Amino acid sequence: MSRAVAQAAETASTFRDANEQLEARADELGLGARPTPYLCECEDGRCTELIALTRVEYEEVRAYPKRFVVVAGHQEADARIVQEAPRFTVVEKIGEEGKLVAARDPRAR
């Protein structure tokens, strides 16, 4: 496995972990169906863009451990696009990167 693949998986997983904490906080605050700001889960470790998602939209992505939500246009060229919406794109990691992110899924721990 290349270092670039491992780094990409690490970066996306780190953003996903942060979003899981945001999700827990949204639940504590009782935000209900209102859109919640989530971090873009792209592979750029410097990205700070936010995506407003309903909790249902977020849970639809998180139902699959290899899927990530990114700002539209932030997907990598080799990404498998699962869903495109005006506000966001859902991508699925494949190959070695997919195995790495699935192993780091906080919901599988």
Language model feature labels by segment:
Residues 1-109:
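Polybasic/polar functional segments that serve as interface/processing modules
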